[in-house]
């Protein structure tokens, strides 16, 4: 019950959790370095946070996070000069820069081509594994999910359909889950939540609306 927590406990919870939305909240005139370093805000005090808006610290952290997504050449670019896919990757770099132990990612591949999507998933998994964190992502790509994540949870209308290792998710199960949307099984399906394997907890949710 987060709403019952005191300010100190609430700050601690915020430090442990990071949400990367499908469309990251990036003010148009903001520099990429500032956008990425926003991932460190839960670990900063108020004065340090305000100072960082003018004189960014930890530039090396931002540069390394951007390099995970081939964006290190955009470090001082304005975000409104980036493409949609680049802005989405800046949002993911912000997650990489954070120190959170629970990483929640909403449709991180929606604006990316297949190779960028594969690279992004590998970077997210690498981050979670190195940190011992839990990575949960919402995807629309069944093939990517099965290839990159250890555990899949299928939901239909908010109810559990299956909760299995990815290796046990068969075409028959997917056909049952998406009985009215079989054309999407070739690559796209309604929101799929996944979690990183290895050191991270492995969760995945495949809701069928």
Q: Where are the regions that the model predicts?
A:
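H-loop/switch region of ABC-family ATPase nucleotide-binding domains
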Residues: 139-140
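Conserved ABC ATPase signature
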Residues: 78-82, 86
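Q-loop/switch helix immediately C-terminal to the Walker
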Residues: 30-44
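ABC ATPase NBD coupling module
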Residues: 1-18, 48-55
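ABC ATPase nucleotide-binding domains
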Residues: 171, 178-209
């Amino acid at each position: 019950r987060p709403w019952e927590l005191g300010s100190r406990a609430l700050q601690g919870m915020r430090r442990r959790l990071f949400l990367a939305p499908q469309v990251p909240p990036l003010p148009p005139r903001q520099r990429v370095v500032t956008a990425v370093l926003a991932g460190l805000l839960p670990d900063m005090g108020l004065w340090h946070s305000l100072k960082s808006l003018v004189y960014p610290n930890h530039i090396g952290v931002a540069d390394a996070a951007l390099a995970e997504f081939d964006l290190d050449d955009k470090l001082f670019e304005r975000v409104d000069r980036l493409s949609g896919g680049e802005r989405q990757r800046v949002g993911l770099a912000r997650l990489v820069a954070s120190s959170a132990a629970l990483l929640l990612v909403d449709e991180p591949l929606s604006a990316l081509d297949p190779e960028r999507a594969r690279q992004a998933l590998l970077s997210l998994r690498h981050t979670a594994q190195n940190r011992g964190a839990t990575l949960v992502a919402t995807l629309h790509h069944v093939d990517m999910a099965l290839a990159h994540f250890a555990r899949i949870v299928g939901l239909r209308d908010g109810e559990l359909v299956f909760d299995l290792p990815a290796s046990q998710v068969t075409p028959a199960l997917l056909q049952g889950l998406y009985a009215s949307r079989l054309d999407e099984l070739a690559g796209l399906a309604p929101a799929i939540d996944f979690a990183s394997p290895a050191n991270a907890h492995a969760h995945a949710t495949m809701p069928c609306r």
